[in-house]
Amino acid sequence: MTILSAITSISRPNKISKSVVSSNGGASLSLSSNSVACITACGGSSYSYSSSYQSSGSGFSYNSSYSSSVGYSSSVGIATGSCHSLCH
């Protein structure tokens, strides 16, 4: 059974986190201390994607990651915090 959910979390006017996850197994969403969205999706042909953008004064930080159970994974991050997602 496919689970499709879209979650939008706004913690501050200058920080917006938006996440979308689709999985035919199970999915879990967790927020780290700096409100960066972490998504883990487990199951056959499932994937997970998370992204966040923060703007404060003259500085900014952006973090995004994508992973798939079919063997492809990629991550790019420039952020002050860290986010870890694991499938068991």
Curated annotation (Swiss-Prot):
One of its GO terms (biological process) is sorocarp development. Pfam families: Coiled. PANTHER family: HSSA/B-LIKE PROTEIN 1-RELATED-RELATED, HSSA_B-LIKE PROTEIN 1-RELATED. Belongs to the hssA/B family. This is HssA/B-like protein 61. It comes from Dictyostelium discoideum (Social amoeba). The lineage of its organism: Eukaryota, Amoebozoa, Evosea, Eumycetozoa, Dictyostelia.
